[in-house]
């Protein structure tokens, strides 16, 4: 394997041996594709011999760089399969932790345990020896905390539920140790975070690893600290991928005051919009459904106000909406504003359960369905159990595509793997293999489109990337079998496996 640490000063490069061949110029743009690529190569240029299939650079329209960074600092619980395994990981971490140190982890999923029952604070009290513990669930919508963590946050029997969240309680009313939605606000100030230099180092490592799985572009949903670190990497010419940033809704006022608009930045780092939560998640049983279940995190008056403010600021809006009730409310609110300004392209993030009657509203609202195919594999049994027959409307990529709804695919990493090849397989072949509503699957061309041109369109970049055509940025994901052999951005190799110049 070879990696390139700096990404400027592109050399005209001819990528051959793959299908199709591609020639890039000194500016990182495509000059020619296919049989004409070699004939068009003149003057000084480099030749790189590849094998396999050259795709437009694959993108991820929904990822969390900040959470991927923090995952490297705490307990990674994604592979734990039971309450016992989680507690053993906490117990092991506590052996080397100071008495007052926080133990933080991410990734537990009680729905996948042999006995799928929610845990409580007393388990953590024993495993951590009284230390404060905070363990975010796989979907990041619930948190499992110890008694000392509750005490430090000032959460008691008398503490009311947040307006957009739930504090689970024991029979006598004391907090059980499970909090759903809105937990970040309650604990954010006390959780340890890395210093600026350490954060940038970890962020650079995360981004490098994303290039290794074939990603050329990612859209991240992150706090302002991540944008600061990304700017620093960009200034040092250490940002190999294209990164599109969507800021949290509580940063909208600051963005307005600074005059940050959709498209602020350049081809490698730009701001697209604001991310806000309509509801919770399936895993935490907080997805807002048309039957009245779940949690509505933003009421209609606040939603309409948010839309107006985003329109005024010329910042796009990415609305997290998983349940069919949340999706319905979002689309109804967005519908009157279609075409309000040229780059107004609101997005419904996740869109996991769409009532068929709301599919035409996507078109009337000009909304993009930003979806993550791997969620379907993880959530299949849970969707059948919680949603019943309504699961026939879940992860309905094929139905949305047939109706003409723009699709942009991603992973929601670290909730799911960021590997786009796994996502492609989930979107195309998995449903037929397991017999789960196979009519909702996609053809390979449509799925590839959602990972390439769809990702570009969801950030207003469809005239510059997402296709292998002259004048477009030379972003390639080269695949042989089920393996990525090379990732190219701006005509420059950022990852290669066993490559040799011709």
Sequence positions of predicted segments:
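Active-site microenvironment of metallo-dependent hydrolases
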Residues: 1-39, 87, 91-96, 200-212, ...
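Distinct, well-ordered alpha-helical segments
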Residues: 228-234, 255-260, 327-339, 361
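An anion/phosphate-binding loop that grips the pyrophosphate of nucleotide cofactors and donors
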Residues: 61, 365, 474
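Structured core elements
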Residues: 104, 134, 217-219, 244, ...
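Divalent metal-binding segments
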Residues: 3-256, 276-309, 313-326, 345, ...
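Non-cysteine beta-strand/loop elements that form the S-adenosyl-L-methionine
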Residues: 64, 268-286, 367-376
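Structural alpha-helical segments in enzyme catalytic/regulatory domains
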Residues: 262-264, 340, 364-366
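His/Asp/Glu-enriched, well-ordered alpha-helical/loop segment
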Residues: 309-318, 325-346, 350-351, 356-360, ...
